[in-house]
């Protein structure tokens, strides 16, 4: 933490919301913080930090930024800025909350911070890839982490049963907490499984997965902020495709005949395309940014199964 003298100097000299936003920006700039866990700019990060610290809605009137802060509010902001700027802890871990597809999730360092572009797909109700959302009665979220993808899908597929899967007991504890938070225990369940191992022949209309996909080289060079996240949720072998390859090979056995598989592989997209040059992957595009998300239908998985086996065994 900052020294007692520095804290007192800050408290004595900075008084308004505006003051603390400006100071937050200065501290983050001085410490070369990285933004990749929700905010897109240093301004957005500073505003989010300060307003969250004092429990004020982010759509406040611009006149309110001149409001004076209580000493206790200043102390909370100072603590948050120290963690974010000096320790370079991602802001969602400081706040213990993250937003995904318009929903709030409780998170901590046991799970990766929700930030997948799949959120846009969920908000758009999977259009144009799923024609009738009422036809989807079962959804599987593989490598669920906080449960954000599967739980957000519950808003789209209101009558579907949703299964969340993770191999991590810690992640499942967080996912179960979020299921209860959103009062979805009647149709969303979380189970421990190494991908499909404990699903015992169940069939799903939609499988969505944001598995670990960071290759070893990228993991070693990632900004400090990412090293707060569980390594299990990031690392996926030399090419970043250890889990994605298993999912692609096994998914058809757990899908209905009209089923759809969506998998995020991030930058490992290029390794996968090079590995499988003859496979016509559908790569989804996102208006809000993001790439490396593939879509395969049940029919495509069956049609190219032998080719996948050949490519993945090289």
Curated annotation (Swiss-Prot):
<protein>
    <recommendedName>
        <fullName>Ribosomal protein uL3 glutamine methyltransferase</fullName>
        <ecNumber>2.1.1.298</ecNumber>
    </recommendedName>
</protein>
<dbReference type="InterPro" id="IPR002052">
    <property type="entry name" value="DNA_methylase_N6_adenine_CS"/>
</dbReference>
<keyword id="KW-0489">Methyltransferase</keyword>
<keyword id="KW-0949">S-adenosyl-L-methionine</keyword>
<dbReference type="InterPro" id="IPR004556">
    <property type="entry name" value="HemK-like"/>
</dbReference>
<comment type="function">
    <text>Methylates large ribosomal subunit protein uL3 on a specific glutamine residue.</text>
</comment>
<dbReference type="GO" id="GO:0005829">
    <property type="term" value="C:cytosol"/>
</dbReference>
<dbReference type="GO" id="GO:0036009">
    <property type="term" value="F:protein-glutamine N-methyltransferase activity"/>
</dbReference>
<dbReference type="InterPro" id="IPR017127">
    <property type="entry name" value="Ribosome_uL3_MTase"/>
</dbReference>
<dbReference type="Pfam" id="PF05175">
    <property type="entry name" value="MTS"/>
</dbReference>
<dbReference type="InterPro" id="IPR007848">
    <property type="entry name" value="Small_mtfrase_dom"/>
</dbReference>
<dbReference type="GO" id="GO:0003676">
    <property type="term" value="F:nucleic acid binding"/>
</dbReference>
<comment type="similarity">
    <text>Belongs to the protein N5-glutamine methyltransferase family. PrmB subfamily.</text>
</comment>
<dbReference type="GO" id="GO:0032259">
    <property type="term" value="P:methylation"/>
</dbReference>
<keyword id="KW-0808">Transferase</keyword>
<dbReference type="InterPro" id="IPR029063">
    <property type="entry name" value="SAM-dependent_MTases_sf"/>
</dbReference>
């Amino acid at each position: 933490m900052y020294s007692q003298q520095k804290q007192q100097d800050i408290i004595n000299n900075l008084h308004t919301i505006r003051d603390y936003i400006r100071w937050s920006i200065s501290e983050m700039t001085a410490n070369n913080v990285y933004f990749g866990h929700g905010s897109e700019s240093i301004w957005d990060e500073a505003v989010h930090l300060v307003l969250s610290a004092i429990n004020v809605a982010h759509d406040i009137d611009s006149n309110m930024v001149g409001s004076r802060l209580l000493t206790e509010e200043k102390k909370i902001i100072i603590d948050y800025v120290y963690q974010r700027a000096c320790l370079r802890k991602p802001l969602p871990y400081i706040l213990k909350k993250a937003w995904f597809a318009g929903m709030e999730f409780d998170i901590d360092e046991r799970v990766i911070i929700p930030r997948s572009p799949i959120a846009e797909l969920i908000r758009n109700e999977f259009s144009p890839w799923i024609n009738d959302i009422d036809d989807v009665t079962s959804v599987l979220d593989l490598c669920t982490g906080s449960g954000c993808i599967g739980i957000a899908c519950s808003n789209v597929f209101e009558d579907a049963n949703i299964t969340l899967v993770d191999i991590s007991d810690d992640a499942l504890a967080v996912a179960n907490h979020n299921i209860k938070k959103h009062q979805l225990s009647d149709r969303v369940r979380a189970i421990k499984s190494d991908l499909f191992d404990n699903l015992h022949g169940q069939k799903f209309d939609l499988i969505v997965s944001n598995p670990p996909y960071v290759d070893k080289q990228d993991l070693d060079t990632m900004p400090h902020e990412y090293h707060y996240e569980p390594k299990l949720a990031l690392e996926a072998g030399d090419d970043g495709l250890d889990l994605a390859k298993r999912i692609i090979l096994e998914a058809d056995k757990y899908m209905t005949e009209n089923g759809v598989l969506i998998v995020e592989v991030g930058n490992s997209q290029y390794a996968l395309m090079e590995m499988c040059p003859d496979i016509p992957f559908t790569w989804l595009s996102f208006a809000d940014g993001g790439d490396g998300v593939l879509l395969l239908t049940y029919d495509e998985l069956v049609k190219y199964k032998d080719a996948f086996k050949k490519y993945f065994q090289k």
